[in-house]
């Protein structure tokens, strides 16, 4: 244990996802040894992100305006929506350059153990987007784990009566893995080989 503010910094850094106690300590000491201008720039960036970034009113992706760059892009295919759990999944898919449609970010996955049900996700907003008949295909790109599969099955059953083509990313993604960690080639092939969901 360190004194006062040093330990406070280590504790706060350790609360970040994927940062364990040793990494938190290493980052804290890097900050302590950094130039004051670098530390101020980091602090300013953190404050600006918190103040300026919001969620897109249409898809739920991160944005600095009411709509994200993807929803504002007129070159995107309006007939296909790819449903993902989190904004970081949008970034992973965009890196593949395989998908030219729009996205819908649910804000998580159905997880009874964590107390997350369908009403806690952006499913109503998705249904509202599908209501005008523009969308012909819905790609379910939730994580290939228990919660992601449950969410995909729930959505497929709910949307099937609408007559839309509902597909799921092909295998090649590790079961139990997170979409954000898949490499571009694997994710690109999963898009190319997506399958029709029959529920």
Curated annotation (Swiss-Prot):
UniProt cross-references to SMART domains, sorted A to Z: TOPRIM
Residue ranges of every copy of the Toprim domain listed in the record: 79-174
Cystine residue pairs: none
Any one GO MF annotation of this record: zinc ion binding
Top-level taxon of the source organism: Bacteria
GO BP: DNA recombination; DNA repair
Record keywords: DNA damage, DNA recombination, DNA repair, Metal-binding, Zinc, Zinc-finger
Keyword S-adenosyl-L-methionine: no
Keyword Lipid metabolism appears in the UniProt entry: no
HAMAP family in the cross-refs: RecR
Family, as annotated: Belongs to the RecR family.
Protein name per the record: Recombination protein RecR
Organismal lineage: Bacteria, Bacillati, Actinomycetota, Actinomycetes, Kitasatosporales
